[in-house]
């Protein structure tokens, strides 16, 4: 998502514990009536979040975080960084959109393994029932460094998201800013495989990238049905599927002058798919696209030694 204004702090408690908090303003929606915008009003969209990081050992870390989105410029209960937002949001009864998350990170030598779980609209009473409102997203991945005894890194990730996450019964309190999802960039009702490899070979910096992403619908009707415990089968109303392969190479021609070459291939099933607005019948109008792209760029790094 695009940047948005925030204010916050981070504080260390000893060597093993770190706490951070921030407050921010997301996009503000202006709502006018049908006759004139002169009688319109603004709907504020604010976010408060805090995170606790704890190192059990030098190799094992757990992150706990909580955030809430609400339709007021300020909410004193959420300005307090040490309050627990989930019960407060239920107590206020304003349909504030609260989320919880937990991350486990394990370092083995110079490699990293992690799993992240994001819970939206957690309903404690229905947690273990077949029909529940525990909407989740999770990510698992690993990062290998110097796997070929050189300066290189391999990242592998898999992300899965429920079709109901990021939404809210109050549509102005969704988990978006300026139309882009916060957190996992693929958004709701999706799954994503990502492989990313970077290495340095002599004067060449090489970046190889592979992405396989599938995304389904999340309409207003589907969200409202979810609050009534009427659930949709995954991808039953259509989807888009995209595979991307890309290579990016940069190298220095002469002092401070570098060139970059990129070659990419995209295979896109149901190109132009709109997960939020398209009627089901419009899927018949979508097409599959295969595309190869090439780009060449030049970069010059100017240094003014007098400013040093």
Q: Residue locations for each model-derived region?
A:
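Exposed, low-structure sequence patches enriched in small/polar residues
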Residues: 56, 60-68, 72-308
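Surface-exposed coil loops of outer-membrane beta-barrel proteins
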Residues: 1-54, 63, 67-95, 99, ...
